[in-house]
Amino acid sequence: MDRLLNIGFIKIGYWELLDGQLHYIMTESFNDVCNNLYAFICDGEVKYIGKTTRLLKKRMYHYKKPGMSQSTNIKNNAYIREALLQNIAVDILVLPDNGLMHYGQFHLNLAAGLEDSIIKTINPEWNGGSKDLTDQSQIEADLNTNTFDDKFQHEFLKFESKDHCFNMA
């Protein structure tokens, strides 16, 4: 957790069970902030890292009441409930985007830029070992296990075998 605090994450709330229902309590000033990187922390251990471009309160609502097809929300709802039932506090930390970072005229979404790196470095349990989709070894493994259909793989290898190698990802 200290690594997150050192880069600017702040505690803004926590999860609780009231009459068997999951609820989140957050500092009002962060309810209506967009482009956030957030974390769920149990006993000082980072359990989950996520990002949202939506309002933070709306993102938390989907963990509170996940839809039937929202597998990440369903899993995290269960993890949060399990921790709370074991009397383990689940805190909510956030790294808000102040909107000041730009590359030329383009706004840089800090949450989008940091999420994969933080997950890869910290490897939070509830993230389920997310992998970097740009990892060349994973791309090669996918090619070797025929995850692409034969036609695409043939075209990919045809491009790769010429004098130039093109990244088709």
Segments from the language model and where they lie:
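Boundary/linker segments flanking structured domains
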Residues: 1-35, 42-47, 53-169
